[in-house]
Amino acid sequence: MSWSKVKYFFFDTPEEKEAAQYGYEKEQTDMKKQQDPPEQQDVTFPKAQPKQNVVSIETAKQSSKVVLLEPRTYSEAQGIADHLKGRRAVVINLQRMSTDQAVRIVDFLSGTVYAIGGDIQKIGPKTFMCTPENVDIVGAISELFGEEEETNIKRW
């Protein structure tokens, strides 16, 4: 048995066997269909806009306010804290208060400022500046206060 008969027996299809019996030649067809490349279409994409920083005008106005206060009693501490929660800087003059109440207000405001992520600084005798996180304090004021003032307020 020749190799061509074995190949014919195992690999040819019944249609090919029948065509071989009648003397027809096998058609050579290319399995790959030739396709035209797809037409190029002009597609326009919107240009990427650079990211713009948008700041609300109301926020800019609130951050530029500084509130000056002279509380006389400890009960006014909550109103001062409300200004800080409203993102406004507050300067507090505690000279018209007793020392005990002034210390209590500073303690209360220190906790408030810590809770909102702000800052509190002494800017003069019995005068403090409290700021929320959106206000930066730059610089420092040296303490050149009189000795008698220092002895009256032991805690500051």
Curated annotation (Swiss-Prot):
Keywords: Cell cycle, Cell division, Cytoplasm, Septation. GO terms for cellular component: cytoplasm. It comes from the Bacteria. Homodimer. Interacts with FtsZ. It is found in: Cytoplasm. The keyword Membrane does not apply. Cell division protein that is part of the divisome complex and is recruited early to the Z-ring. Probably stimulates Z-ring formation, perhaps through the cross-linking of FtsZ protofilaments. Its function overlaps with FtsA. Gene3D superfamilies: SepF-like protein (3.30.110.150). Residues 20-50 are annotated as: Disordered. Residues 20-36 have a biased composition (Basic and acidic residues). Belongs to the SepF family. GO terms for biological process: division septum assembly; FtsZ-dependent cytokinesis. This is Cell division protein SepF. It comes from Bacillus cereus (strain ATCC 14579 / DSM 31 / CCUG 7414 / JCM 2152 / NBRC 15305 / NCIMB 9373 / NCTC 2599 / NRRL B-3711).
